[in-house]
């Protein structure tokens, strides 16, 4: 294990949207910044799970691809040259007698005056399809992530699920796939109302309320899927080239739970300054919680500057929490 002896003003744990915007804002406040990300790339779930998916609820963008948003956030942060550490997961956080912090990862030891946790939902894994042979076909043509939408051009695709991801992927596949069928075990979808309206007007075939009963295939992958009616005797077998499963994700904060932080429902409670119960440790984005919290990318973009400005005052009590508007800082 190596020791990174440089002392940073702010170390951001998590390189997703909130973390990247926080890195930019901290740079704008002339803080020495480090970002530690456990994944091989920046962007969090946007890059890892749906880089080709369009996002519609970010201010200023009628729509923007997830990876394009990550690229823009990265370029914005890089203006101030924060130190980026990839493929390191922070295991321990320890406060020292001099009020600074020591962060130990699986590879290095890092030193910082303040910490901002923007770890999203923490470590995540997809909920798997619980049908015989599903694990065998997973490396072939059963997909839990979509990294290249064009790979489904001209294909017969079945999407299984009823939430936002399932509906959004079905709509995005409709123009390029040969045919798209969306299967959900309930009559009603849990997706955004506007997306459901678009779905009903699309050519996507909707099969509800049905659930997966059997997979048919060979050594090359699934060739057909049999679905059974949830409260009936009807079955239907659909020929497929690819199956996309969107049952959501199971997430955990992992080692973060052992850092002495208050934890509430797999999130970190904060006050209006984004302060946790440990002075000098802040949280923003989906990992943070408070009364009325709404988990949106846009919400994290507001929380990040609040956390950074208060961290600035924490390490330098003579600093102002509100630095003025960016138009006067550049």
Swiss-Prot record:
Its cofactor is FAD. GO terms for molecular function: ferredoxin-NADP+ reductase activity; flavin adenine dinucleotide binding; NADP binding. It catalyses: 2 reduced [2Fe-2S]-[ferredoxin] + NADP(+) + H(+) = 2 oxidized [2Fe-2S]-[ferredoxin] + NADPH. Transmembrane segments: none annotated. The keyword Flavoprotein applies. Gene3D superfamilies: FAD/NAD(P)-binding domain. Its EC number is 1.18.1.2. Binds 1 FAD per subunit. It is an enzyme of class 1 (oxidoreductase). FAD binds at residues 37, 45, 50, 90, 124, 286, 327. Keywords: FAD, Flavoprotein, NADP, Oxidoreductase. Belongs to the ferredoxin--NADP reductase type 2 family. Homodimer. This is Ferredoxin--NADP reductase 2. It comes from Shouchella clausii (strain KSM-K16). The lineage of its organism: Bacteria, Bacillati, Bacillota, Bacilli, Bacillales.
